[in-house]
Design a protein with these regions (language model features):
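Condensing-enzyme catalytic core mediating Claisen C-C bond formation in acyl metabolism
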Residues: 1-26, 199-258, 262, 266, ...
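Flexible glycine-/small-residue-enriched beta->alpha junction loops
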Residues: 92, 102-150
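Conserved beta-ketoacyl condensing-enzyme motif
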Residues: 21-90, 95-101, 107-118, 181-189, ...
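Active-site pocket-lining segment
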Residues: 244-313
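Conserved catalytic cysteine-centered active-site region
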Residues: 23, 51-100, 139-144, 195-218, ...
Length: 365
C-alpha cells in the first residue's frame, strides 16, 4: 500500500499584523480544509492531522475540524518548524495502516498567538517569554538568529552572499504565478515578496552578526493542507503525488540551521536517488545561510531549488511551513521526484520525498 497526495491547498502567507491579523487558527485552517475536500470530491475523511507550534494547546486540529464541519477527533502535533511535514508523514502512516483518506497540514497565527508566561517557583511574578526553550540546557540553546550568525561565521558565508540569496528569492517569487491559494480576507497572493535590490538589502537592519532583517524569514500567518489517500482512491485522480519516503531526525541543537541535511540525505539514500535526479526541491528558507549551507552540503541544483521563491520572500508560519512546501511541490511538480526539506529549532529537521504521476498516465507511477 502506498500513500498519495491527491489534492493540496494553502492560504497566502501574510506577515504577522497584516491582513490575517484578526483571524484565528480555525479561521485560517477551515477554509483551506474545505477547499481541499471540494477539489477532491471526497466528502469524509478518517482523520485531520494538524501541525501547530504557537497555539498553546486546546487541540487546534479539533477546532479546525469542527469549523470545517468534519466529524473527526483531530490530532494536533508540535514539532515546531518540522511539524507540517511530520503531519503528512503521520497521514501516510494512517493510510498505510488502513485509513482511506486523511487530511494533513499545518496552521499558524503569529498574530493571534497566546502570550506565554513562565511561573516563578519561588512565588514571584510570572515572566513573559516569546521564544520557548528548545533544549534543557540554557547555555546550549541559542536563539535562532544567533545560531545562524555563528553558522555563517564558521562557514565563511558573507553578509553580501546572504543578501544576494535573499534578493534572488524575492525575484523568483515576484515572477511566479502562485497556484493552490485559497483567497482569504481578500488576499489571494503572498503578501511579502517585493522588489528587493542589492542596495536595499544592504541597508537592512542587522539582527545578529551577518544576519539581517533581509536574510531571515519574517514571522507570518498561514495554513496549508493536503489530502492523503491510498492506492485505490488515488487511481481516480488524474494528478497524484506518491509519498516515497520521509524522515525526521535530530542533530546538534547548537547548529539548527544544518538540521535538514541529514533527513534530506536519508530519504534520498533510502530511495536510491541522487540529488541530480530531483526535478524540484522545496527548501524552507528560514535564514539565507541555512538554505545556502543545505544546498551546498547536498549538492542540489540551484535552478531546481525553490523555483518560485522561498521563505525569505514569503515568511515563516512556523507550524504550517512544511505543509506549504508540500503544496508547492504538488502544484509545481509535473513528473519525476521532488523533495521537501525544513530545518527546525532545537536541531530537528524533516524531509519528504515524493514522486509525481503524470496527468496523462492515470494509475501509473
Amino acid at each position: 500500500m502506498s500513500a498519495w497526495i491527491v489534492a493540496a491547498r494553502r492560504t497566502a502567507v501574510v506577515p504577522r499584523g497584516g491582513a490575517f491579523a484578526r483571524l484565528s487558527i480555525e479561521d485560517l485552517g477551515a477554509p483551506v480544509v474545505r477547499a481541499v475536500l471540494a477539489d477532491s470530491g471526497v466528502e469524509a475523511v478518517d482523520e485531520l492531522v494538524v501541525s501547530n507550534a504557537l497555539g498553546a494547546g486546546g487541540n487546534p486540529a479539533r477546532r479546525v475540524a469542527l469549523a470545517a464541519g468534519l466529524e473527526v477527533a483531530g490530532l494536533t502535533i508540535d514539532r515546531q518548524c518540522a511539524g507540517g511535514l511530520d503531519a503528512l508523514r503521520l497521514a501516510a502512516a494512517l493510510v498505510e495502516s488502513g485509513a482511506e483518506a486523511v487530511l494533513a497540514g499545518g496552521v499558524e497565527s503569529y498574530s493571534r498567538r497566546p502570550l506565554r508566561l513562565a511561573t516563578d517557583p519561588d512565588g514571584g511574578a510570572p515572566v513573559a517569554y516569546d521564544e520557548a526553550p528548545f533544549t534543557p540546557w540554557p547555555d546550549r540553546d541559542p536563539g535562532m538568529a544567533e545560531a545562524a550568525a555563528r553558522l555563517a561565521d564558521r562557514l565563511g558565508m558573507s553578509r553580501a552572499a546572504q543578501e544576494a540569496f535573499a534578493v534572488e528569492s524575492h525575484r523568483k517569487a515576484l515572477a511566479a504565478v502562485p497556484a493552490g491559494i485559497v483567497e482569504l480576507a481578500g488576499v489571494a497572493r503572498d503578501a511579502f515578496p517585493r522588489r528587493l535590490t542589492p542596495a536595499v538589502a544592504a541597508r537592512a537592519k542587522g539582527v545578529a552578526g551577518s544576519v539581517t532583517a533581509a536574510t531571515m524569514a519574517v514571522a507570518a500567518d498561514g495554513a496549508a493542507f493536503c489530502l492523503v489517500v491510498g492506492d485505490k482512491l488515488a487511481a481516480r485522480f488524474p494528478r497524484a503525488m506518491r509519498i516515497v519516503a520521509g524522515a525526521t531526525l535530530g542533530s546538534d541543537p547548537l547548529e539548527p540551521g544544518l538540521s535538514a541535511i541529514a533527513p534530506m540525505r536519508a530519504v534520498l539514500d533510502r530511495a536510491g536517488i541522487g540529488a541530480g535526479e530531483l526535478e524540484r526541491v522545496e527548501l524552507m528558507e528560514a535564514f539565507a545561510v541555512q538554505a545556502m549551507a543545505t544546498i551546498e552540503a547536498l549538492g542540489l541544483d540551484m535552478g531546481r531549488v525553490n523555483p518560485e521563491g522561498g521563505g525569505l520572500a514569503f515568511g515563516h508560519p512556523v507550524g504550517a511551513s512544511g505543509a506549504m512546501l508540500a503544496v508547492r511541490l504538488f502544484h509545481g511538480l509535473r513528473g519525476g521526484h521532488g523533495l521537501a526539506g525544513i530545518a527546525g529549532a532545537g536541531g530537528v529537521g524533516a524531509a519528504l520525498l515524493v514522486q509525481a504521476r503524470d496527468s496523462t498516465e492515470p494509475g501509473r507511477i
